[in-house]
Each structure stands twice: as C-alpha cells, then as structure tokens.
C-alpha cells in the first residue's frame, strides 16, 4: 500500500481581523485605487475568461504581444512621471563619520567551535528583512520592530498587521534586519504624532496611519495607505530640495532609527546560539525602474557609520562601493549583496559600468571586493535563470517573477539572471578582463513584516495588510459584489488615470476575479546557508566572504560541493572523508587552477541531505558553464545522482521519473519515492582543460504543494488555474571555477 505524508498541518496560522476594522465596509473600489496609484506592487490587465491569460504569471509572458505592448506604454509613463528628476536626485552628502561603540566588538572564535574545516556546520538564516523602519513596510501596516523581528527568528510568534500570529516551525540560526536606508524611519516619524518631525506640515497627511482605529483592510485604512505609499517619497524629496523640509532634521530621524537598529542587533546577538548582523538595504534603481537593490551587511558593530548610504546619497552602485572602501580603510568591514536581478531590466549584470564604459579590471576588482555573494532567490522570484535563456533546462522556470520591481513592465532577460552573468564573466576573463561576476549564492526572504515567509503552508507573502488575506495574495478569487467592484473599478481607473506601475489590478481567470500581476508570482523563498566553524558574526561573515555558502528556496536542505583531481570515493564513506576533501580539493566558492604540469580533470564530490520537515530529494544535478573553442558561452544541466539508486540515462543525462506525486486535494505526498540523502563522486566526461568553466550543484526535491494551493485548500476552492499547483523546492551551491593553465 502506498504511504502518504502530509508535510505540515494545513492550518498553521489564524486569520482574525482586528475589532476596530470590523465596522469598516470592505468597499472594493479600494483595490482599484490602490493599483492605479501604485500601492500594490504590480498591476496588469488580462483578457476575460481564459485559463491562461495575456498577463500570465508563467515564464512565457516575455513572448506575449499584449504584455510587450503594455510594457512599452509603461516605459513612456515612467519617462513622464518625474519631470523634475526627484527620483534620481542626490539630496545628501556622503558621510563617513563613525560611531565608536566598543561594545559591539567581535568575540574570538570559541574553543568549542570547529577545530578543522571538516567540522564546519551548516547554519541557516535570512539576510533580507524589513520592519516598521522601512517606509513601505510601515505604509503596509507593519509595526514590527527590529526587536520583534529577532524574536521571530528565534522562534517566537509575532503579530501580522492582519491580526494573526506568524511563527516559524523552527528557529533560524542568524538574521539581519535590512530596512531601506532611503528615509529610514521617516514614515513612522511622520505618522506618530509624539515625534518632533510629525509637527512638519509635510507629515500631516500621514498622522495616525497605523493607529488602532485605522488599522485593517477596510476602505478608510487602505485609502490612507494608498496616499502614503504613492506620495511619500516624491513629496519628501521635493520638500527637501525646495527647503520646505529641513535636511538636517530628516538626517536626525534617519540616524536615530539606524542607532536603534544597531542596538537591537547587539541585544539579540548571542554568539554560539543566534547571530545577528547590523545591516540595511541600499535601494537604487534606474529611471525605468530597473532594480539595483543591495543589502549591506556589516561584519561587526564596534565601529559603524552614523548613517547608512542610500540612493539619496547616490543612485550609482559604484558610489556605494567607494563609500564601503572608504569605511574599510577605517577598519569597518562590510559587503553588499545584490538581489532581485530578475527585476533589474538587464541592469544588474550588464557589460558596462554606470557611465557606459566597457567593464575593466578596476571595476571588477572593486565589485568583487564589495560583492562576493548574490541573493539568487527570494519572495519576488528566483534569479538563477529563465527558460528563454536556458531552454534545455526543464527546471529553469522555477518561481519566475518576470516584471521589474514595483511595476507590471517586463524586465529584460539579458543582464538580469545569475547563470548568464556567470557565463559573461567567463567571456570577460577570456578577453583578458578580470571577472566581476564570480560570486557565491544565498537566498533570503525580503519580508516587509519582520517575519520570513519561507514555508509554503505557512505563507502570508511580504506585504503586511496588503497580503494578509488569500484573495490579496492572488491565490483565491474575490466573490460577490467585491469581485465586480474590484474588477470593473480597476479598469475604469486604469483608463482614466494611467499609472506607470501598470494597468488594471484585477483580471478574470475562467470567469473568476483575481489580483493580477506580480503578486501571485511571489514565492515562499528563501534561505541563506553558510558552512562555518560556529554560529558567530565572525565565523559566518568569513564564510560569506570565502563564498562557502549556498541558497535554498525555503527548506533546510544541506549540500556540500568539492572539486579536485585527487578526490576519491572513500571520502563519501569514511569518517575523515570531509577533512580529506578540504585538504585535497576546494569547496564551493573556490577555484581549481590547472597548471601546465597538471591538467587532470577535477572530480566533484557532492553530498546532499533532505530537510526532514520537507519532501525527500529527487535528484542531484551539476550545472556546467564554459567557453567553447569558438569563444561562445555554453551551458549544460547534468543529473549526477537519482533517488532510489536509479541510473542516470547516458544519452539524456537525466534521472528516470521516480513516481513522486502530490494529492492536490490534501497536499499529501508519497515520501517513499525519494531519498533522505544523495551523494556522488562525479567527473565531467567532456572536460577540456584548455577552456574556462564553472560548475555548481543543484539539489531538487520531490514535488510538493505551492503556497497558492495551500491557500485554495483552506478556502475550499479549486487552485487558481494559471498558477502552478506544485513546485520542486531546491538548493544551489556556490560555483567552483576551473581556470586553465596559461600559455
């Protein structure tokens, strides 16, 4: 008899609207107005009654003529929306004054930590978390403080703006609050009338935004949030540039919030048990909303800048690196981690610098010095690759979010995905230029409620009040009068008040009204994982720096990846095998440098373990990229180990179907078809010692229910037909590069 496994209890959280909001009518026109003025992250139009619509959430939207035409219209609106250049303005001078704190000094690695590399443990965490100090988080109803965020990461329950508890099934090992540096804390200071800044006339429209009588999903509350999100940033910039708002007073608010973030990180940092990092998000973008966001992570907290460097110091990421280099010269070590390259419209990994010059050694060396790691997966999609870039990779369509961040305009593919960047880095090396794209991989969440939403059956997205109900997440339809008002109201507003964020916010799928655009494409992802001697700032940071890190889409899959000509099968079988692999090879993030005397093909030692709370593993893969004899980039996906001891097909280089299934009515799975562990010693049969190449491991689970299917089950409705019902969670190791001998 086939056994089934319910991954987790289907009712992980409760929905209970606050009493103060129950008296408010959910007048559905709110959704339309919210979309038109950009409160929702994305808005788009769909044809009525189709199961696969023009604004599909699938990866094929880049070939859809209607979406392409809409993108052209949005691009024109983006050009017209900011005639005074407020969005790209620099309104603050770069500041390098340090806070000398002393108490935040890094402890030495303890005697109880690992004494050899082989004893390193895998630690899991999130380096991308927003709280009430982020302007958008506060506008979405978030009142979680940095202290609340750290309590959540340690396993405690905190309250979602929708009124229900959020709690992880297991605590995390490390966490970093990364609030937006741009106007850090200013939305909160404007809204809360006990602050001095709230006395400014600029702040008056935002007074009491998150007071108890204006807290919920009702009409009045949502309209005020609309005004905050749509007008806050441009009005603040315009006010500072005109002199209406005192620049120094704003800097005072920013510095006060920054100090509180630092204090919270130090208060919850518990070396050996739970690690926090002082951090923030640098939220730059191009005029057409090409995403250039980075999270800046500080190694310690004994010396820190008195204010974070934001887009309002400069929108040029190279200026951020200059600032970081300057701090490094004063003894302040940090790194920046790019994220959501998928929404960068080709800007994150382009082949020219900010000024339009070809990339050179100086650019590459500075970028790698400051950005050794990239965030490859998070709630706003996975940035590994895209089916149109990797058409022979049948797993390339995983949790694709195809739009630029905060718009419904398509994001260009070239320059936006990590695997292509790795390949372009090889091409640059081949031409004699230092590789600027030689990075390690992590995942993180980008939650805006203080709570990482990384579990499919426990997912409430990232948008606070705007995603606290399943219909707001796009997984279940609106019904009755709500549905008709949302649907037709959004169309009227889209026609009468075109928004650079996109068109109508709601669409019909098989006759049912759903939220449209990017929100349904969001995923319950991801986690950063590091192989470190112990759970301390110093040990974890050094793991990030040497790129001995890996990413997961949420489950705590574990993966090791080594390369070296002298690795052997016994390393998989003996107690000292890992120590010997470290001694005789390199691990993820490293280089295999061939010499004229030794051009032997490296062997790859790969080990993966399933998360006991998730599904078993289905397959272990190696992704290879290289430059061929014609100087062209090539890639290949190779299955190297299969669940159940099955053999990889020598022609297709794929594992056979292992019979894994999901019961969509209950989300039950058949766990006996998968593996708790997969490991192999693999050699590339096509290895050419004369070419540049990279390899990384990808671990694929058996299928499980996507979060949207869990939502549908709870609501007692069928899963949304244009969303994937299941997915295959995964992990990615950082790459290992193979460098040919010179001459």
Task: Kindly label every feature range from the protein language model.
Residues 1-24:
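N-terminal secretory signal peptides that target proteins for export/translocation
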Residues 22-35:
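Sec-dependent N-terminal signal peptides
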Residues 297-298:
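Long, charge-dense tracts
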């Amino acid at each position: 008899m086939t056994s089934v496994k319910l991954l987790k209890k289907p009712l992980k959280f409760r929905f209970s609207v606050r009493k103060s909001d129950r008296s408010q009518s959910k007048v559905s026109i709110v959704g339309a107005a919210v979309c038109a003025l950009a409160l929702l992250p994305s808005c788009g139009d769909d044809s009525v009654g189709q199961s696969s619509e023009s604004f599909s959430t699938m990866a094929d939207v880049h070939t859809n003529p209607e979406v392409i035409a809409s993108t052209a219209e949005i691009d024109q609106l983006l050009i017209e929306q900011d005639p005074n250049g407020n969005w790209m303005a620099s309104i603050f001078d770069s500041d390098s004054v340090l806070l000398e704190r002393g108490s935040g000094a890094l402890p030495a690695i303890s005697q109880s930590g690992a004494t050899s590399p082989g004893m390193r443990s895998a630690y899991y965490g999130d380096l991308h978390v927003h709280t009430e100090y982020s302007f958008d988080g506060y506008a979405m109803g978030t009142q979680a403080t940095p202290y609340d965020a750290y309590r959540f990461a340690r396993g405690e329950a905190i309250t979602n703006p929708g009124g229900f508890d959020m709690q992880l099934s297991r605590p995390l090992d490390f966490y970093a609050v990364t609030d937006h540096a741009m106007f850090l804390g200013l939305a909160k200071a404007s809204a809360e009338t006990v602050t001095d800044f709230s006395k400014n006339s600029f702040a008056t429209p935002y007074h009491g935004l998150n007071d108890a009588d204006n807290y919920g999903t009702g009409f009045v509350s949502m309209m005020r949030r609309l005004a905050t999100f749509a007008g806050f940033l441009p009005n603040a910039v315009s006010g500072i540039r005109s002199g209406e708002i005192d620049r120094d007073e704003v800097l005072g608010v920013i510095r006060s919030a920054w100090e509180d973030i630092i204090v919270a990180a130090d208060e919850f940092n518990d070396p050996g048990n739970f690690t926090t990092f002082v951090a923030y998000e640098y939220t730059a973008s191009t005029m057409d909303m090409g995403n250039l966001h980075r999270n800046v992570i500080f190694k310690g907290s004994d010396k820190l800048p008195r204010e974070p460097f934001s887009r309002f110091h400069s929108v040029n990421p190279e200026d951020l690196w200059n600032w970081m280099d300057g701090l490094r010269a004063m003894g302040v070590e940090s790194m920046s981690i790019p994220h959501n390259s998928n929404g960068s419209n080709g800007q994150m990994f382009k082949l020219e610098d900010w000024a339009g010059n070809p990339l050179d050694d100086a650019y590459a060396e500075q970028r790698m010095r400051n950005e050794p790691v990239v965030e490859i997966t998070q709630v706003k999609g996975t940035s590994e690759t895209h089916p149109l870039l990797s058409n022979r990779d049948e797993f390339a369509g995983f949790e694709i979010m195809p739009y630029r961040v905060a718009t419904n305009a398509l994001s260009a593919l070239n320059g936006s995905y990590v695997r292509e960047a790795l390949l372009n880095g090889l091409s640059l090396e081949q031409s004699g230029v230092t590789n600027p794209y030689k990075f390690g991989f992590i995942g993180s969440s980008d939650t805006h409620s203080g709570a990482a939403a990384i579990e499919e059956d426990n997912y409430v997205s990232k948008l606070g009040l705007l995603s606290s109900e399943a219909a707001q997440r796009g997984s279940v339809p609106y019904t009755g009068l709500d549905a008709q008002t949302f649907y037709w109201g959004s169309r009227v507003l889209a026609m009468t008040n075109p928004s650079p964020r996109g068109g109508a916010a709601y669409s019909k799928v098989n006759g049912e009204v759903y939220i449209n655009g990017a929100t349904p494409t969001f995923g319950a992802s991801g986690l950063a994982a590091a192989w470190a001697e112990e759970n301390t700032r110093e040990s974890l940071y050094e793991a990030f720096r040497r790129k001995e890190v890996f990413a997961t889409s949420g489950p705590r899959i574990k993966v090791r990846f080594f390369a070296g000509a002298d690795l052997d099968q016994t390393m998989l079988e003996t107690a000292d095998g890992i120590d010997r692999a470290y001694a005789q090879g390199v691990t993820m993030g490293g280089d295999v440098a061939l010499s004229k005397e030794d051009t032997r093909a490296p062997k790859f030692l790969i080990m993966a373990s399933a998360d006991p709370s998730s599904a078993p593993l289905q397959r272990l893969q190696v992704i290879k990229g290289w430059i061929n004899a014609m100087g062209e980039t090539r890639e290949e996906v190779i299955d190297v180990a299969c669940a159940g001891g099955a053999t990889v097909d020598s022609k297709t280089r794929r594992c056979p179907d292992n019979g894994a299934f999901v019961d969509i009515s209950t989300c039950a799975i058949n766990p006996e078809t998968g593996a708790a562990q997969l490991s192999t010693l693999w050699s590339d049969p096509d290895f050419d010692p004369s070419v540049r190449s990279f390899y990384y491991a990808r671990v694929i689970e058996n299928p499980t229910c996507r979060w949207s299917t869990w939502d549908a089950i709870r609501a007692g409705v069928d899963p949304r037909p244009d969303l994937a019902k299941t997915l295959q969670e995964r992990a990615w190791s950082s790459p290992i590069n193979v460098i040919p001998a010179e001459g």
